[in-house]
Amino acid sequence: MLRYHTSKNNFPLASDLRRQRERMVITQLEQRGITNSYVLTAMRNVHRHLFVPEALQSRAYDDYPLPIGYGQTISRPYIVAIMTSLLEPTPGLSVLEIGTGSGYQTAILANIGLEVFSLERVRELYFQTKELFFLLGYRKIRTCLSDGTLGWEEHAPFDRIIVTAGGPNIPLPLLNQLGDPGVMVIPVGQNPREQELMCITKKNNTVTSTVIGNVAFVDLVGDYGW
């Protein structure tokens, strides 16, 4: 059963939430160097509080991750913004998301105008977000309940791939399903609770990687993960 409320009249007041959302964009994103207009606009448009449990809605725009159940979290706003910016998103590009989770990152990608494919392994989250996307009008997002480390061969290649969980290595199926040219953003690390955020680019059959910084994500579970 869906644990999230989509009514704009729920507590906190809609006007308060709008102010919180604008403050989030200014203080957490713009003042920290996020400049991509697609990302900033999407994070102003998407109501983050609708993607967290009702009891946490008043904290939805704070600068830290929040639990969403089943051992999963919604990433802090800055991490969502930096990962999305690294994708160099342009409307019309296809993107594969590994780990639908709360659905917030998925909605940001869809709001930008990307063609979104999203995989989730936690059954309860898969059905919750599927219903939530329908209620919020995100009818073009395609989701699947499956092992995200295997990718989604049926719809490959993808212009972009974003992985929202950390594994010990870059899953080979994802690298194979990344288009050329293409960009993948993924946390990688041998420590299950500490990874390096990496930006992988593929161009002219050459793959290059850049370490962006240290991050901490939940485990990437699957055949090519933990």
Swiss-Prot record:
Keywords per UniProt: Cytoplasm, Methyltransferase, S-adenosyl-L-methionine, Transferase
Record has Transmembrane as a keyword: no
Listed InterPro entries: PCMT, SAM-dependent_MTases_sf
Catalytic activity: [protein]-L-isoaspartate + S-adenosyl-L-methionine = [protein]-L-isoaspartate alpha-methyl ester + S-adenosyl-L-homocysteine
Location in the cell: Cytoplasm
One family name in Pfam for this protein: PCMT
EC number: 2.1.1.77
Broad EC category: transferase
Superkingdom field: Bacteria
One Gene Ontology MF term: protein-L-isoaspartate (D-aspartate) O-methyltransferase activity
GO cellular component, one term: cytoplasm
Location of the active site: S75
Family stated for the protein in its record: Belongs to the methyltransferase superfamily. L-isoaspartyl/D-aspartyl protein methyltransferase family.
Function: Catalyzes the methyl esterification of L-isoaspartyl residues in peptides and proteins that result from spontaneous decomposition of normal L-aspartyl and L-asparaginyl residues. It plays a role in the repair and/or degradation of damaged proteins.
Protein name: Protein-L-isoaspartate O-methyltransferase
Organism: Lawsonia intracellularis (strain PHE/MN1-00)
